[in-house]
Amino acid sequence: MNLTPREREKLLVSLAAMVARNRLSRGVRLNHPEAIALITDFVVEGARDGRSVADLMQAGAHVITAGQCMSGVPEMIEAVQVEATFPDGTKLVTVHHPIRHEA
């Protein structure tokens, strides 16, 4: 199987997101790379499903909460930028303050 560098990167993010989901299901708090991977995968898959950029920017901030992350991780991530492929082309999606404290 021959994959382009972009396809390899997407596959790696997807795998990291699977690991993060598995850890969350066991009650393990996420570290920085796992949190980024989970949010990134959410945006990439949402774009593939046909969701809008605005919708993903908004919904991406509710994928995980501060309580699901290791101490200090939410403060480390001010924004996550994802280049995702939408039905009408590739677009940059920015999720500001993606890990919020529970209300």
UniProtKB/Swiss-Prot annotation:
It is found in: Cytoplasm. SUPFAM superfamilies: Urease, gamma-subunit. Gene3D superfamilies: Urease, gamma-like subunit. Its EC number is 3.5.1.5. The keyword Cytoplasm applies. GO terms for biological process: urea catabolic process. It comes from the Bacteria. It holds the Pfam family Urease_gamma. Pathway: Nitrogen metabolism; urea degradation; CO(2) and NH(3) from urea (urease route): step 1/1. The keyword Hydrolase applies. GO terms for cellular component: cytoplasm. Keywords: Cytoplasm, Hydrolase. It catalyses: urea + 2 H2O + H(+) = hydrogencarbonate + 2 NH4(+). GO terms for molecular function: nickel cation binding; urease activity. Heterotrimer of UreA (gamma), UreB (beta) and UreC (alpha) subunits. Three heterotrimers associate to form the active enzyme. Belongs to the urease gamma subunit family. This is Urease subunit gamma. It comes from Paracoccus denitrificans (strain Pd 1222). The gene is ureA.
